[in-house]
């Protein structure tokens, strides 16, 4: 992935963005960096929503006594993967 930002210092989580990656218009800012940020935010929201759906599906299977089923284990695996991704993002201050 091509980076649009550069760290100001190695100790801080402060970044700068080149002007060529964004432009201002009457509605705000646009450009490749803004588009990438928007996609990232969509992915993050989708992960949160998926976790909620998975939790509901797992609870339904638990109530049916199907905790040993292939479907339950597959959904649990997906939930754990999503949880690890969200945990990594939280490590970097993204919540």
Specify the residue positions occupied by each region the protein language model found.
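Extended, charge-rich alpha-helical interface modules
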Residues: 2-95
């Amino acid at each position: 992935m091509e980076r649009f930002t550069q760290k100001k210092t190695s100790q801080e989580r402060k970044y700068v963005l080149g002007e060529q990656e964004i432009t201002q218009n009457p509605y705000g800012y646009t450009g490749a960096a803004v588009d990438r940020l928007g996609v990232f935010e969509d992915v993050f929201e989708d992960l949160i929503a998926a976790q909620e759906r998975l939790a509901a599906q797992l609870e339904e299977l638990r109530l049916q006594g199907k905790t040993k089923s292939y479907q339950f284990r597959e959904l649990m695996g997906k939930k754990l993967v999503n949880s690890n991704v969200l945990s990594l993002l939280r490590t970097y201050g993204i919540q």
